[in-house]
């Protein structure tokens, strides 16, 4: 069978995990992709540096892992990465932000109306430090009151004695 143009992926990958793109700017990008007859938008939504999409019931992913700033324990935000994120309350920074469930549904609908398929990527099990740290914060939040809830989504094995250093100098991902 010969392939028609409709079978070809003309794609754009956007890494919003490391450098967040606000919804309005993402919608503009979708318009540009449509203008150039591109048909796939690959969104890199998570990585070691951040988590960018709301998951109902796991608010720590966005309350903690969508922000970078000064911290000693990463219970409120993640360490700055790639020179971004010195102030976790700066909503204009490329380091901070996430798409709410409603935002993400709007993005999907907007893209579909322009014949663009969105491929959301959640990078696991590797490159999961943002999720790991968020679930550690969740563990700390509940361990004194509800051990079952504290451990339900825990991604850390406290008995693991592995020693390593990632490319970003992390020892816990």
Language-model features, listed with the residues they occupy:
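Hydrophobic faces of well-ordered beta-strands that scaffold small-molecule active sites
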Residues: 10-14, 41-43, 118-122
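Domain-scale activation on soluble regions of proteins
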Residues: 17, 117, 124, 129-132
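Short, small-residue-biased leader/transition segments that mark boundaries at the very start
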Residues: 2-9
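Short loop/turn motifs at secondary-structure junctions
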Residues: 4, 37-39, 57
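Short acidic, glycine/Ser/Thr-rich loop/turn "cap" segments at secondary-structure junctions
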Residues: 10-17, 88-92
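Aromatic- and acidic-residue-enriched carbohydrate-binding clefts of CAZyme catalytic domains
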Residues: 49-113, 128-173
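A conserved hydrophobic secondary-structure block that centers on an alpha-helix together
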Residues: 15-48
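Aromatic/hydrophobic pocket-lining residues that form π-stacking "cages" and hydrophobic walls in ligand
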Residues: 29, 107, 118
